[in-house]
Amino acid sequence: CHCVDCRKKIGGIISIIQLRENAVDIDKSKLGTYEHSGGSGNKIKKFFCKKCAAPILTYVSKWDKFYLYAGMLDDVSILKSAYNIFYEDSHFPFMEISERELKT
């Protein structure tokens, strides 16, 4: 994700994984949360570790989807495809991805 919100919250572009409903069992009651409006004005809910504040999940109300931060995975080889989202509007000017490499 290249969006301004992710860059400001994480400090750079991030890898996120869209979760299918019931794909993983995460006890959200053990996580801290905060809500804010994203760049589009839609509500975004962030879930983080209460001990170290590491980001765990993001919920985007507009799409009714949960996203897991890929950095949480021990084995990233299970990931099959990658897409760059919000690239056109928000990417770093020094980071150019060719049309062939860009999947949106």
Language model feature labels by segment:
Residues H2-T104:
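A short Gly-Trp-Pro
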